[in-house]
Amino acid sequence: MARAVGIDLGTTNSVVAVLEGGDPVVVANSEGSRTTPSVVAFARNGEVLVGQPAKNQAVTNVDRTIRSVKRHMGGDWSIEIDDKKYTAPEISARVLMKLKRDAEAYLGEDIADAVITVPAYFNDAQRQATKDAGQIAGLNVLRIVNEPTAAALAYGLDKGEKEQTILVFDLGGGTFDVSLLEIGEGVVEVRATSGDNHLGGDDWDDRVVEWLVDKFKGTSGIDLTKDKMAMQRLREAAEKAKIELSSSQSTSINLPYITVDADKNPLFLDEQLTRAEFQRITQDLLDRTRKPFQSVIADTGISVSDIDHVVLVGGSTRMPAVTELVKELTGGKEPNKGVNPDEVVAVGAALQAGVLKGEVKDVLLLDVTPLSLGIETKGGVMTKLIERNTTIPTKRSETFTTADDNQPSVQIQVYQGEREIAAHNKLLGSFELTGIPPAPRGVPQIEVTFDIDANGIVHVTAKDKGTGKENTIRIQEGSGLSKDEIDRMIKDAEAHAAEDHKRREEADVRNQAETLVYQTEKFVKEQREAEGGSKVPEDTLNKVDAAVAEAKSALAGTDIAAIKSAMEKLGEESQALGQAIYEATQADAAAAGAPGGQPGGAEPGADDVVDAEVVDDDQESK
């Protein structure tokens, strides 16, 4: 029997896990990491980079690097690169293909089946788009499972026979969910779920970026938001600072050569961010997690004291302020520390894959639909057929009638949401039931049936009880992809798989070389165009030019050894260039501080004292 994997397709990072001898194992990727950045980049030579290699080159390839695409799933978002349009499911499929390859390399066999997780609060269109991404990646998606449910499954299977109530607080890179589950005797039942599909760690990063932009503008007068490359560097620095502040009270954010001033002099960003300041600028984001928590407690009608365990999911829950808020909301209950928040969802997905494949016995997973489903009736009212937090799979029917005399057809508009007015909810799709015999209004009987499968995907049927005529819609328009488009994308992905594998081997070296060439050329150009002439001798610049030309020549070919050699030489020349810039800057500063032409350094000054200390340190270290 072919193996099945569990995949946590995340906004920021993704994880793949598999069952080995009945136990879930998180698979390390080809770079040796257990998490893979959900980043896809299109290099200018046509190569597609996924994961860490894509993230590494983002600074020099901003417009062709896509991250956090999960936030666009189910919408009409697309990006055009080299005259080709890519949809969100297509980009997500690239991440899934890498996870599939890495798992196949680990297992030594092909993988066809997968369970993929989604945020509990994902609507029908977003779920369908995720399933489409799996198909494009060459995977048979056995089941779409809610992330908190997968986490509870991973957490709860070894907790014995006693029934327990578990609260899962899931704050990821781009989405937030709270779910309340009951676990006991091999049954995992979701009682209620709530959340926010546009709240996650990315938003905390954005606040730090805004803070840095304001600080830099205040000191230099330059607005970095107009510089795409600078903004990419700020984003990476913000994420790093956020992570560091989870374990320390302050962090330094130091970005050399972030931009240049009007005189082409390089400028540096150097700021100190404390945990207190970080929490101050992100407090409103934290407060947005309160309402979904309260909603889940209200929907289930339980008391906070009835919660037995609190499980934190998602890397963003490592922030101390988040942990403290969860403790406050749960009446001082200490969150469970026995699970890895980055991996627990993929582990649960692998277990569910095992259940569906028959490898894991005596486990029943009862999930719920996160939002109410219904149709628009007279007056634009939303008439709900399936209430939110109903256990799935489920099927509900209700009989409606016509609003006008001799009405020959009815338009069925399917909505998802909690608002009383249909138009304020999410329109999932619409279809028409025709051929209704002429009759006074209120006489025809139209039975509308909603059927939600275990993936949370909706099928709606309308049937005229008088004639037996019926029409059915499977809600899939939300993904924006037809079956033909999905088939085309699958073939396209398969055709490029071998080519991608060949290119991947040289990707890291090539990215590093391209980055070095770009940065070096930029600074050489700035020096030559500087007012008052370059601060660096022309022969130094010429040597750098020659090294750049050699590196470009190597990059034009496919010899990795030649690229490495040229990169090392360019690195040496770049260091010489940097040293010359610093020496010239120091000489200018010394001349400015020594009026009357006195030789700088004729008297021992503060600089000499620092030099002496450095020498002493070196001697002591020897």
Curated annotation (Swiss-Prot):
Ranges of Gly residues compositional bias?
594-603
* Keywords tagged on the record: ATP-binding, Chaperone, Nucleotide-binding, Phosphoprotein, Stress response
Q: Which Pfam family is an annotated match for this chain, by its short name?
A: HSP70
Q: CDD domains recorded for this chain?
A: ASKHA_NBD_HSP70_DnaK-like
UniProt cross-references to SUPFAM superfamilies, sorted A to Z = Actin-like ATPase domain, Heat shock protein 70kD (HSP70), C-terminal subdomain, Heat shock protein 70kD (HSP70), peptide-binding domain
Which InterPro entries does the UniProt record give? ATPase_NBD, Chaperone_DnaK, Heat_shock_70_CS, HSP70_C_sf, HSP70_peptide-bd_sf, Hsp_70_fam
Cystines in this chain: none
Q: What induces it?
A: By stress conditions e.g. heat shock.
- Please verify whether the record's keywords include Nucleotide-binding: yes
Where is region (Disordered) located?
589-609
Instruction: Describe the function of this protein.
Output: Acts as a chaperone.
Q: Which HAMAP family does this one have?
A: DnaK
| Matching NCBIfam families | PRK00290.1, prok_dnaK
The entry's protein name is Chaperone protein DnaK
Q: Give me the gene this protein comes from.
A: dnaK
